[in-house]
Structures are given as structure tokens and as C-alpha cells.
Amino acid sequence: MNYQYLLRQIYSTEKSESQKTAVIENPYDLDSHEQKSINSSYDLSVLNTSIPAQEIVEMVQNAIVNDRKSQGKEKGIRILFYGLSGSGKTNLAHYIADAIGKKLLCKNASGILGMLVGESEKNIAKAFEEAKEQKKILLFDEVDSFFRERSYASQSWEITLVNEFLTQMEKFEGIVICTTNLRNIMDKAMQRRFHIMVEFKALKDEGVESLLGKYFPHFDFSEEDIRRISRFQSATPGDFGNLSSRLRFMNQEKVTETYITEELCKMQEEKEFGKRSIGFRD
């Protein structure tokens, strides 16, 4: 079944409720319609996630269709993406939005946390209300600041912040996706509220090979080059994009397979040094 097309029919603002109901009741009768495909520029296959990326998309699609059929039952989809910085969490959120024909409303901690007492809580409530009114997927990006375990809170506002987020998330009937690099500091009650929790891990060999080909297509990398990069177990898609951007400013005669491999390895060494410096443990 072409879920992408089906969901566009359900959410279309040009269709009446009776037309939408017909699509729900007869989801396989799509042959007479023009079917559109989603943006294919984002390659899900390179991601290393605890749940396969395409399966995540299908889970969301299934929930939307089933929610439309079941009146009065649980509504809303709550998703948590956690793991390494630059591992594709935000990009997958955009892909999901594209897959179901909806837009993202993106929020981050800097835009939510306020200086005045109660301001942050109001901003959280406002974000959920805005997503509801605009019928968008709500993405809270890197929101470690208000996911913190309440038992460790040193200020009362930290507790009320988590409480407000829990309240708003539970009553929200749309899709909310949250991303964090630090799941280990998250409030336990917060974690239990998510329907889908996905860990984003370092790239495997095949992911490294695929991204080398995508970002540096004119170079011929050896299997040893690929193994050198992936053995650190910290390489992410963001590393390749960052290095590709930097190479614009270089004399291209100096850019070789060896240089690219060395630079990517240096990035991983810097990550490892950073973890040791601030006392992180695996």
C-alpha cells in the first residue's frame, strides 16, 4: 500500500469529511488516483538505529490510519529520538513529516526557556497550542534542559518545567517528536510517556561507505579507509556533511582519499577526548 498517498488524502484540506472517510474505509482502492512519492534525497539506509528507520516511518503511518478509524480511543503519537549528536535525529523527523504530507513546527530549548518565573511553562504550552492550530508535527530539538530527572532538580522551576511538559504532551492529539543527546538524565516518568523510543548509534561500515560515496563521489576509498573511520564507533552523518562543507575552502589538489580519511578520524578522536575531559563514561 502507498501509505504516503493515503495519508495525503486523509489530511487534504481540499476533501470533504465524507471523502476522507471513504479513503479510510477503502484504503486499498487507490489505483484511480495520481500517487505522489516523498522526497527521496534523504537516505534512511545509512542510519544505525535501534528500530530500522523505515519501520519507524511505517509505525507512524499505521498509527495515523488506525487513529482515524477508532473514535474515542487514545490519540496522539509521542516519539523520542536519542543518541549521538549529528546522527540524523532531526533529519528523520523531517523525513517522517514529508512521508505523511505534513509540516514541522520546530522548537528548541533556547526558544522555550525564559528568564522570568513561569515564562518557560507558558512557552511550552504555547508551542503545543501552535502545533494544534496549524496541524503540524511538533519537533522539540535537543531539549535536554527540560527533560531532566526531577529527583535531581535543585530549583523548583525545574520540577514545574518537567510537569508542564508532561501535561501538555499527554493531552496533545497530534504528533510530537523530541530529540536529545542525553537520555540518561531524562526524568523516568517522561520516558514512560513516549510510544516510540529510538536510539541513534554510530555509523556501521556500510553507512560510512555510503556517505563517503555521497559526499565525496570523485574519490576511491579503500576498505581499510572505511574500517579506520568506523572503528571509532562514533562517526555520524553530520561528520561527513561538516567535512564536505569545509573542503570548499581548500586547494582541491590537496584533497585526497587519505586526507579525507584522516580528517574524519581526527573528528572521532576529538569526540573521544571531549568525553574524557568532561567525565563521561560509556
Language-model features: where?
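C-terminal alpha-helical "lid" subdomain
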Residues: 2-45, 193, 205-282
